[in-house]
Amino acid sequence: GRYDVDAIHMDDYFYPYPAAGMPFPDDNSFRKYGLRKGYSEAQRNDWRRENVNTLIRELKRTILLTKPWVRFGISPFGIYRNKKSTADGSGSNTNGLQNYDDLYADITYWVQQGWIDYNIPQIYWEIGHPAADYITLIKWWDKNANGGHLYIGQDVARTMKADQLTRKMRYERALPHVSGNCFWPANEILWNNKGVADSLKRNYHRYPALIPAYTHMHNRPPKDVSKLKTEWTPKGFLLHWQAEQSPTNPELASYFVVYRFNDKEPIDTSDPSKIVAITRETGYLMPYEKGKVKYRYVVTAVDRFHNESEGKTKKVKL
């Protein structure tokens, strides 16, 4: 509880990835704990899954008791179950390692139970991969999002090597339950591998984005900002406001979004191209343009759960 974090994140390591000819050595643990709980030898895999379930459930419970606004998420291996492994054919049309059967990680169950707040499956394969096709998998995860926050884990190097960034972005953006992407590893973006950063900035991430609200955790927006005013300061022409804030109350304003609209255009805060600042400050220095052009600035407040308030508007001549 000492650190001001937004989320606790776990990667894809639960039970270890299986190695050929090396069964996981948990005989003693199973005899001591599994058999005592009523599991038979034939149910050892169920016992393993319940062990991981307990870990995930208790982590979520502990986070809720400590800082209820902190999110808990997982980036699991990209295949939940292959179709051939499921009696009802509910698995994906893939042929690879499986979370449920090999790592004993029941991802979709965790989402259903509300134990994780977001899911980032690692869909690191290419479009057309013979065992794990990218399109097949993102469609499967979208269909099985179960109302949770779903993001797609992207392998930067493999995507750029196959020249598939444009196609992948187009496909995932067409799916109704996908909220965005997580690019791995970050240094490939920083190094601009094959122009990936340029392409993202130019084509897909041209404007700032707001984090989707975690309404299953808290669904009431904070109070609107008040006393929205302009003032000349030694640093320039300042737009400033007041808001109710507290570091110990996640339902109050945590940060603010500043939008700018031309004088006659309709105000639409769902348009990200109008965002000029996302800030934790209660002021924004506006670019002064000889005082002849009319604009309308809109300021909203956002809480720790990313619920956004209604906007307050100020007409300004710049």
Question: Model segments located where?
Answer:
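Core-facing hydrophobic residues within beta-strands of well-ordered domains
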Residues: V5, I116, V178, P222-V225, ...
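Solvent-exposed loop/turn segments flanking beta-strands in beta-repeat/beta-sandwich domains
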Residues: E244-S270, G311
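Short S/T/G- and acidic-enriched coil/turn segments that sit immediately N-terminal to beta-strands
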Residues: R280-L285
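Substrate-binding cleft of secreted/luminal carbohydrate-active enzymes
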Residues: Y104-P130, I138, A145-H218
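Beta-strand-rich modules
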Residues: M286-E308
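Pro/Thr/Ser/Gly-rich low-complexity, intrinsically disordered linker/stalk tracts
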Residues: S199-P250, H306-L318
